[in-house]
Amino acid sequence: MYTGSHSISMDPKGRMAIPTRIRDALVESCGGRLVVTAHTEDRCLLVYPEHEWLALLPQIEALPSFNKVSQRVKRILIGYATPLEIDGNGRVLVPPTLRDYANLDKKIMLVGQGKKLELWSEESWLALLNAPAEDEIPGEMLSLSL
């Protein structure tokens, strides 16, 4: 389970060091093999351990092809999906197309989301946290006790 928010740096080549706790968990669960893709609604990236992505992929592929929203989701998730591997220095290289999609620069945030991680530009992450709530709490969340 991946939790926590980590402020990290990305070098000009697009390499970022994975924080030790997260890196160790990723190496243990998937040998450091990841799949990174674009989020369908926010300008951030989704980082999956390879086995989690492979389990999710059939569900994505099964989305109806004649539904425009489903087709858009499939195009983004599968079209941007890129396999990555943690190198010997504990870093991954994020390709330029994905960096551009999420507006990633030097300062980035790696945010745990349970079975996956999200990768945000620090500026976008802080804007999200500071944005006023736009919607009411969905009914299915009302029973959640924090």
Curated annotation (Swiss-Prot):
- Tell me a GO biological process for this protein: negative regulation of DNA-templated transcription initiation
Question: What GO cellular-component annotations does this UniProt entry give?
Answer: cytoplasm; nucleoid
Quick one: where is this thing mainly located? cytoplasm
A GO molecular function annotation here is: transcription cis-regulatory region binding
**Where do the SpoVT-AbrB domain residues begin and end?**
5-52, 81-124
Q: Look up keyword Metal-binding and say if it applies.
A: no
Keywords, sorted A to Z? Cytoplasm, DNA-binding, Repeat, Transcription, Transcription regulation
Which cell locations does it reside in? Cytoplasm, Nucleoid
Question: What is the protein's quaternary organization?
Answer: Forms oligomers.
Q: What is this protein called?
A: Transcriptional regulator MraZ
Q: What is the lineage of its organism?
A: Bacteria, Pseudomonadati, Pseudomonadota, Gammaproteobacteria, Cellvibrionales
